[in-house]
Design a protein with these regions (language model features):
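C-terminal beta-sandwich/jelly-roll accessory domains of carbohydrate-active enzymes
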Residues: 104-130, 142, 150-208
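Aromatic/acidic polysaccharide-binding cleft in carbohydrate-active enzymes
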Residues: 3-133, 141-144
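Intrinsic structural disorder
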Residues: 1, 68, 98-99, 171, ...
Length: 208
C-alpha cells in the first residue's frame, strides 16, 4: 500500500491576497522544488501526489481577463517534468547546515518542520537543522543522468562538488538550467511575467 499525498501546496490559506500574483515568489518556487524532491526520494512509498490548486487561488497558474500568468512555482514543475528520469538513484549531501525555525501544525498541534528560509540563521525555538543543499538524482536506461539541485540559503550562493561513486569521469554535462533571482520574494506578474523563469546556466566544470 502506497501513500497518496492529496491536495498539497507550500502555502497555507492566504486570507489577504490569495489571488495576488505577488503573493507567490521565488521562496514559493524553492519550497515547491524541495517538496517535489521529497516525493522523488520517497517514490517507493508515495504513489500519488496531487498539487492543489493548479489554476488560480494559490496555484501555479493564474488566469486574468487579459491572459494568464505562470507564477514562480510553475517553472519548477516545467523543469522537473522535462528533466527527471525514470529511475531514482540515492544521493548524499555532505556539508553546511542551516538552522531554520519550525511551526506547530494548525490542525494537529504537533510540530511540523515547515521551512522558513527568510528566518534561517536566526536560532529560535523550536528549530531544526537542514542541509543547505537539496539534491535528487534520477536517470534513464540510455545512461542519461539528471541532477536536481536546490540552494536553500536565502541570501548566499553556494559552490558544490559532485562526486559519482561508480562512474567517475564517465559523464559530461550536456545541459544545465537554473531558476534564479536576486530577490527571494521576486514574483511573476502580468507586468513582469518572466521575473522567475528557467534560464540556461553555466555547465559544471569537470575535474580529474
Amino acid at each position: 500500500i502506497k501513500v497518496a499525498w492529496d491536495e498539497w501546496n507550500v502555502n497555507g490559506w492566504i486570507f489577504d491576497g490569495v489571488n495576488d500574483d505577488n503573493s507567490y515568489g521565488l521562496d514559493n518556487a524553492i519550497l515547491t522544488a524541495l517538496i517535489l524532491q521529497m516525493f522523488i526520494r520517497n517514490c517507493d512509498t508515495v504513489g500519488m501526489a496531487n498539487y492543489s490548486t493548479f489554476v488560480n487561488i494559490n496555484g501555479a497558474v493564474s488566469v486574468h481577463p487579459g491572459g494568464a500568468v505562470t507564477r514562480a512555482q510553475y517553472p519548477v514543475f516545467e523543469l522537473l517534468a522535462n528533466h527527471t528520469g525514470k529511475y531514482f538513484y540515492p544521493s548524499e549531501v555532505i556539508g553546511e547546515q542551516l538552522v531554520v525555525p519550525t511551526a506547530a501544525g494548525p490542525k494537529s498541534g504537533r510540530p511540523s518542520e515547515n521551512i522558513n528560509l527568510a528566518g534561517s540563521g536566526k536560532r529560535k525555538l523550536p528549530s531544526c537543522e537542514i542541509d543547505v543543499i537539496g539534491v535528487t538524482a534520477t536517470g534513464n536506461e540510455d545512461g542519461t543522468l539528471y541532477l536536481s539541485i536546490v540552494n536553500k540559503h536565502p541570501d548566499e550562493a553556494r559552490e558544490m562538488r559532485i562526486h559519482l561513486d561508480h562512474a567517475p569521469g564517465a559523464y559530461q554535462c550536456v545541459e544545465a538550467y537554473e531558476i534564479h533571482h536576486a530577490d527571494l520574494h521576486a514574483a511573476n506578474t502580468a507586468e513582469h511575467p518572466d521575473a522567475v523563469a528557467i534560464r540556461a546556466a553555466a555547465r559544471p566544470t569537470q575535474q580529474e
